[in-house]
Amino acid sequence: MKKIITLLFAAIAIMSCNKTSQKKQTAEILRDKPWQEISPSEIELNPLQMIDRDWLEVSAGKEGKMNLMTISWGSIGELWNKPIFTVYVSTSRYTHQFMEENDYFTVTHFPASMKDKLAYLGRVSGRDEDKVAGAGLTVEFTELGNPIYAEADLAIECRKIYAQQFDACLLPPEQRAWYEQTGNGIHYMYIGEILHVWKK
């Protein structure tokens, strides 16, 4: 009986190590894999899956002064005959000031093995610590100087073409109550024209 229990624990330990190894391997493979530029219409991921379930990182700023945060609100589509990506950032978030100060932002998608890293990036503020280092990400910069990440499998670079804060007076009662109860700053909507899309 003791031998069976010992073997069982050993099997569990091996499975755990294998899962950790697979996660590491996925990140390492993507880190070394070159980006391939595609058109916005060639994005294959389901938007609802990509935004609401997988989560994304929105980043703004330049080398030496940038920030990123995890988002699960957003949309992709067409406006004024331009392909667009829309993100929503609360005024209480550190990323908000970077979105205001910069003309561009990027949206990046990561493999499922990185979900715990995205949870960390959504939980911790860049005011308090170096989130990029904490998540073990490798920052790369586009020709326009905007941050994307070597461990991501999709990167979307946008030029900000419209920004406006939600009008509290026009919010549905339940949403207005949510802002009042949580103390979260009312979100800004940022619409970005998609300039470049890269995948791995």
Predicted regions mapped to residue ranges:
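Structural motif marking the loop-to-transmembrane transition
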Residues: M1-K2, I186
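Sec-dependent signal peptide recognition
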Residues: K2-L8
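C-terminal motif of bacterial Sec signal peptides marking the signal peptidase cleavage site
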Residues: I14-S16
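Active-site-proximal mixed secondary-structure blocks
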Residues: K19-K200
